[in-house]
Amino acid sequence: MAAARPIILRFESRNGQFRLSVSPQEQFPFLKEKILENLPKDVEPSSLVLSNKPIGTGGQERQLKDLTGVSIERVGLKHGDKLFIGYQDKQASQAAPAQKHVTADVSRRLNGAPVPETETVAFHPPTSPSATIKNPWEVVQQSPLDDMLDKKDGKIYRPRDPKMCKHGPKGMCDYCMPLEPYDPKYLAEKKIKHLSFHSYMRKVNASTNKAELKSSFMPPLTEPYYRVRRDCPSGHPPWPEGICTKCQPSAISLQPQEFRMVDHVEFASPDLINSLLDFWRKSGAQRLGFLYGTYEEYTEVPLGIKAVVQAIYEPPQVDEIDGITLHEWPNEKEVDEVARQCGLEKVGVIFTDLLDAGRGDGSVVCKRHIDSYYLSSLEIAFASRMQAKHPKPTKWSRTGRFGSNFVTCVLSGDEEGAITVSSYQASISAVEMVRADIIEPSAEPSVMLVQSEDEDTDNKSRYIPEVFYRKINEYGVSAQQNAKPSFPVEYLLVTLTHGFPTEASPIFPASTFPIENREVIGESQELRHVAKKLVSHGDPDKAIREVSDFHLLCFLHSLSMFSKEEEALLCRVATTHDPTEGLKLLNTPGWATLVTVLQESGERPPKRPWLNPADPPRPLSQQGKRHLPSRPESPKSESEQLAKRFKGASLE
């Protein structure tokens, strides 16, 4: 049998392309030497990978060493076919085998300036926009609220107009037919500035998927991507060593966002705001807290969503008169778990920006107004990072996520000197520009700076595309402006409405336990506060009511006295206020352990059983005294009991 005629195979790596003349009966491992001759000298031979598609794009990637016994003709390769090669260099293989690989050539920017070797990617490691999910509507798990809003038709129904409608009661015309939730005339009439997320999604879907065309469904939403693609199929070295029109982002044209992910922020009780303001009133320093609550339907806007805030948790921080410095939050996951068991989630952040006016009437200085700013560039960057950490899962996006429901609230003074709440979100473009390290805050709070590739102060490698925005010039004409070096922050901001319910019904009505991380103003969370709140009064019904405090639940969780089932019961009692569940809680081993610990620490509960609710609680007015009473007549007297209690508490 005559030997098969040799064929030409094409190979492509990030260093370029080359051809090899091979025999169809030749096995793949025997090609190693020929392949290495066409690659850089520092390639690790054992890391060679072959694929039928560009490396990292979902092709059938196989290690060359694993193809022992597999011939070229066996896999169906023919004359002129192309294979893609991936590899690691020796230095990268020894230091970090899982990292991306770069060649030993000097990396340079687009302007020719060399890139330092120690540069790293900023913020989050860039991913590729091509990493989409196949059929996301079958895989992505949305929130129950989104599923419920998806099932609604969203139409705005109108009654028959007696002046314009000429038909009968069962007819319909242009003057009474239902409107789409994104109808511009209806929104202008109701003074709705932004579309709700689901209204915007249906507006985009109406133009993306037309039922009359009977084409396959395509997810209508796509998040912007302003970073360099890392899986470019052109075959050039990855950025910053190489770039082309396929992998570089297009120019950015900023414009006000027409929709918002959340339409309204509702605080379950005014006490939530007052407790945060108390810190400023006592110290004069600013304060920050994270909002925990739920997302519900907002009926004032078509297909609207509102964030209902039920609790504010204040993380470790250093507070000053003109700002806040956040510290590491070691128990964040534990607090999130307590909130989850209560049916809550982290919905946003709130901070104060207050300065007393000095008039003695409680008025504050108005810093934020139309002639200054509403949210500073630093605060927008902070809000963008928070939203990037809390993406919104949705089956209507190709990547399975789109935007974020995370909100940002500010307590500041209005034009009348009163303290008011303002609610905002950073736009989708702002979040991506912060991810891509394109913008940075400015010392002037009303403008945002555009980064420059030449700035190496942060030791970062980044690609900065062109950024433009439109403004009304001195001639009254809308003109496009280059955003470099800075542009107004209003292009990155979305305003929300806020308010309080007509009748407050918070799920934590007994929020009197000391708030965490307030030692700087002399407030701390101690066992004596737990005893005073839960057991000192001797009333089981009151104990069930008093456990309904989010700060108390977090403190009890940190004590690790309850099992998972008991803690779930504790959170259920705190949110439902069910007396039957409360009695189950009082009879659990965890509750008995808590009472024992309070007793051993000097916070002794009553000796006798629970008192009759009709009986008044025992007075504890002498609890703060340190002197011992006079010698009692009987060792069983109340004075001796108090003396023993104070002695046990002397280590405070």
From Swiss-Prot:
Any one GO biological process: protein transport
UniProt-annotated location(s): Cytoplasm, Perinuclear region; Endoplasmic reticulum membrane; Nucleus membrane
Gene Ontology cellular component annotations, sorted alphabetically: endoplasmic reticulum membrane; nuclear membrane; nucleus; perinuclear region of cytoplasm
Domain of life of the source: Eukaryota
Major localization listed first in the record, in broad terms: cytoplasm
MPN domain residues: 265-402
UniProt keyword terms in alphabetical order: Cytoplasm, Endoplasmic reticulum, Membrane, mRNA transport, Nucleus, Protein transport, Translocation, Transport
Protein name as it appears in the record: Nuclear protein localization protein 4
Role according to the record: Involved in the import of nuclear-targeted proteins into the nucleus and the export of poly(A) RNA out of the nucleus. Has a role in the endoplasmic reticulum-associated degradation (ERAD) pathway.
Gene: npl4
UniProt feature, compositional bias: Basic and acidic residues: 633-643
Family: Belongs to the NPL4 family.
One Pfam family per UniProt: zf-NPL4
Annotated GO MF terms: ubiquitin binding; ubiquitin protein ligase binding
Membrane topology according to the record: Peripheral membrane protein
PANTHER family, per the entry: NUCLEAR PROTEIN LOCALIZATION 4, NUCLEAR PROTEIN LOCALIZATION PROTEIN 4 HOMOLOG
InterPro entries registered for this protein in UniProt: MPN, Npl4, NPL4_C, NPL4_Zn-bd_put, Ubiquitin-like_domsf
Disordered: annotated segments: 601-652
